[in-house]
Amino acid sequence: MELENFKGQNKNELSMIEVAHAILAKSGEPMAFVDLANAVQSYLDKTDEEFRNRLSQFYTDLNVDGSFISLGENTWGLRTWYPFESIDEALIHAEDEDEDRPVRKKRKKVNAFLADAADDDDVIDYDSDDPEDEEVEAEDTTSDDAPAFEDLSNDDDTDVLPDGIEGQLSELNEDDEN
């Protein structure tokens, strides 16, 4: 493949992104990433090992570079081919196509620890025996406790302890000091 944009230039000095842009511009249609990568590799005359070492950077550059657009299913095109409005419409139509696909049935879950799922005799339902799970109505305890609290509010703060305990704690013997 000969690209007119790069006639007379050293292929070792060309970036893979520049070559990919020229290849897509020449072909005029979107290409799968694999085909685009192979075309870039063959144009730059890179060995498989050299190209494989730079392949991840090439893919990253395709994503980051604003002149390329991913069209889904790892197909790439030039952004200039698609007006902004058609990009939104293409994405919306792609979502509509997904809805037309048949819906996969969900598989029935199998419990590997039970020999027969229909035989529930040995299975214990732990959710139904917890009394804390049952809702209990809150009792009105304000009327019962109110007189007891009133008694405490009238309590005298000048309570005096018998001198026996306080006196023993505050007295120091001469023997205790040594």
Curated annotation (Swiss-Prot):
Start and end residues of each HTH HARE-type domain: 14-81
UniProt record, GO biological process: DNA-templated transcription; regulation of DNA-templated transcription
Cross-referenced InterPro entries: Asxl_HARE-HTH, RNAP_delta_N_dom_sf, RpoE
Positions with biased composition (Acidic residues): 120-143
Superkingdom classification of source: Bacteria
Assigned keywords, A-Z: DNA-directed RNA polymerase, Nucleotidyltransferase, Transcription, Transferase
Region Disordered, residue ranges: 120-178
Single annotated GO MF: DNA-directed RNA polymerase activity
GO cellular component, one term: DNA-directed RNA polymerase complex
Assembly, per entry: RNAP is composed of a core of 2 alpha, a beta and a beta' subunits. The core is associated with a delta subunit and one of several sigma factors.
Described function: Participates in both the initiation and recycling phases of transcription. In the presence of the delta subunit, RNAP displays an increased specificity of transcription, a decreased affinity for nucleic acids, and an increased efficiency of RNA synthesis because of enhanced recycling.
Family as reported in the entry's similarity comment: Belongs to the RpoE family.
Name of the protein this chain belongs to: Probable DNA-directed RNA polymerase subunit delta
